[in-house]
Amino acid sequence: MSKNIYPVPTHIKNTALVDNDKYNKMYKHSIDDPQSFWAEHGKRLDWFTPYSKVKNTTFDKGHINIKWYEDGYLNASYNCIDRHLKTKANKVALIWEGDNPSQSEHITYQKLHDEVAKFANGLKKLGVQKGDRVAIYMPMSPQAIYAMQGCARIGAIHSVIFGGFSPSAIADRIKDSGAKVVITSDEGRRAGNCVPLKANVDEAVLQESVTSIEHVIVHQLTGGDVDWHDHDIWWHDLVADEEPVCEPEVMNAEDPLFILYTSGSTGQPKGVVHTTGGYLVYASMTHEYIFDVKEDDVFWCSADVGWITGHSYIAYGPLVNGCTQVVFEGVPTYPTAGRMGEVVDKHGVTILYTAPTAIRALMAKGDEPVASSHRNSLRILGSVGEPINPEAWNWYYEQIGKSNCPIVDTWWQTETGGIMITPLPGATDLKPGSATRPFFGIAPAIFDAEGNTLEGEADGNLVILDSWPSQARTIYGDHERFEQTYFSTYPGVYFCGDGCRRDEDGYYWITGRVDDVLNISGHRLGTAEIESALVAHPAVAEAAVVGYPHDIKGQGIYVYITPNEGITVSDELTKEIRNWVRKELSPIASPDMIQWSPGLPKTRSGKIMRRILRKIAANEHEQLGDTSTLADPSVVDELIENRLNR
């Protein structure tokens, strides 16, 4: 735990939206009287029919029900675009920065409106209606935003699938959502390489078990060769004759806006459902207050729209607030490690929101990341995706921000819809590695394993005591799983699945997942999902997957495999297994270390003792603890002897 404290800088405090006194006052109001607090802040949106009901929620066992602004009517796309046209039609909404540094495009709010309206009309022409699900598998192009906003405009529910996922992962998500349309590009571009997006979609939708797809819309990005099928249609042909006018569908606040799949510990991805009203209130409010957003700011969130960060802090929050933002197709180290700083200078970025993984990757490059840029425009820095270690925090603060920019280290989840625990730039003294204090309306607590509340300085499991507007409403098609996953461990509260420590100043420190979900470079992957892919390989009898500390990615993937009888283990087989997982799941899921073993440590009831595997993977085998329940303790000796992470 870092002992250093960084006070709020005077130059930030003097102009900030919220200072410490205002934070304390607003926070108290939000907890003491959430009804009046959120009634007031719901007015930040434009409503076709104003709400009279604000909060109607219960976490009671068997009756989990979450509703906010339930009698209000609005449209997400209208709030992101149309309401700005009277005063900001010519303001830049999106600055698209290509993978190739020579490519960029400025898109005004008027142009955004016109492109979204034309695409929305195209969707309607294909028979897409309110409530239909639409899958989106695209690179970080303006068209990805047009697609999301186009769906929202007509009331279709989008399900964005990260462009790094494999055909089988795409197919699983399409089958679960029942999507009738997929939107993709011919290819994506990443670090100078082409990514076969259309080919992956083809492989997914041509599976016999995928029966719901009626159309595949293809945006031509690279001009690369693609196979063509009867259900395919080019984006440019779809919108060619469409007018740039499309009346926004009137949506109830509780109508679903999107489904976003996230890894579950059981192996089957969970379709997290977010609705329209409360989600937009919270996404836009957190964006404004946490990043201290002003009219002339240029915001850059470096996430992908395939993840929740790209939904809340690219596709929705900043646009609701009428902000100018960078949409980045590339990676921060291509073509050189100086790229991130160069993009900041090129577009005058004032607020940068990125992940510890990117920061650690840049740290490893010495002076190169900062040598080619001055970054004088930066005012606020942010971190997202996983806890940031103090070393990376200090480097980010000193090197990227020149010791002049507060860092908002934000903790939240796909299921929370928006940032939950975070500093506010003008209100919070910073401690490197701490997410600090809860945002307005968030009531965190720390429980021990038995569900007792821990007061004061404490270390345990993080829970949230009451609902907030952007909370996920359910898991698509499986409300029972929603209740089981988030509300059964500690009945009556929301269980985050994260360990947490609270220090003597009341600051919160997130210590990582307590379930079988890994956090790889800020991407959540279920160990069960990876294990399922591994045991599908004919050479694998049994597999166990654990995380271990990784200098760049935060967590690495360590795999223990027992081969089938008669299988000869070799470097070639190890390489084949690694590529197998890449193909079955995603390159992100590719194992960092693969240890072959004649057996795995199991209890007498046959349960694999993952605690022991985690200790060995982390090279902490001296701290194994009690092994008395093992069926065969000699297995552990063999695993320690042949461990890979020394």
UniProtKB/Swiss-Prot annotation:
Binding site for Mg(2+): V535, H537, V540
Gene3D superfamilies, A to Z: 3.30.300.30, N-terminal domain of ligase-like
EC category name: ligase
GO molecular-function terms, A-Z: acetate-CoA ligase activity; AMP binding; ATP binding; metal ion binding
BP-aspect Gene Ontology terms: acetyl-CoA biosynthetic process from acetate
Residues engaged in binding ATP: G385, E386, P387, D409, T410, W411, W412, Q413, T414, D498, R513, R524
Keywords, sorted A to Z: Acetylation, ATP-binding, Ligase, Magnesium, Metal-binding, Nucleotide-binding
Modifications the protein undergoes after translation, according to the UniProt entry: Acetylated. Deacetylation by the SIR2-homolog deacetylase activates the enzyme.
Reaction(s) catalysed by this chain's protein: acetate + ATP + CoA = acetyl-CoA + AMP + diphosphate
Cofactor dependence: Mg(2+)
Signal peptide residue numbers: none
EC number: 6.2.1.1
Modified residue annotations for N6-acetyllysine: K607
PROSITE patterns membership: AMP_BINDING
The organism's place on the tree of life at top rank: Bacteria
GO cellular component, as recorded: cytosol
Assigned protein family: Belongs to the ATP-dependent AMP-binding enzyme family.
Protein name (database record): Acetyl-coenzyme A synthetase
Gene that produces this protein: acsA
